[in-house]
């Protein structure tokens, strides 16, 4: 039988078995998953892109709501 794939938890670095048995993958625990979610919510993580503001991106695209 082959060895299960192991990855590092993105939050704490602990080894994590990548399998259907691990409901938190790629995280080692619910705690690490929630820490990562909190970091995204606090805008500590960002997806690379241009620095255009939302107003510039969407101005004139939609009719104003009344």
Curated annotation (Swiss-Prot):
Residues 45-66 are annotated as: Disordered. GO terms for biological process: regulation of DNA-templated transcription. GO terms for molecular function: DNA topoisomerase type II (double strand cut, ATP-hydrolyzing) inhibitor activity; zinc ion binding. The keyword Metal-binding applies. The keyword Metal-binding applies. InterPro entries: DNA_gyrase_inhibitor_YacG (IPR005584), Znf_NHR/GATA (IPR013088). Binds 1 zinc ion. It comes from the Bacteria. Its cofactor is Zn(2+). Keywords: Metal-binding, Zinc. Zn(2+) binds at residues 9, 12, 28, 32. Interacts with GyrB. Inhibits all the catalytic activities of DNA gyrase by preventing its interaction with DNA. Acts by binding directly to the C-terminal domain of GyrB, which probably disrupts DNA binding by the gyrase. Belongs to the DNA gyrase inhibitor YacG family. This is DNA gyrase inhibitor YacG. The gene is yacG.
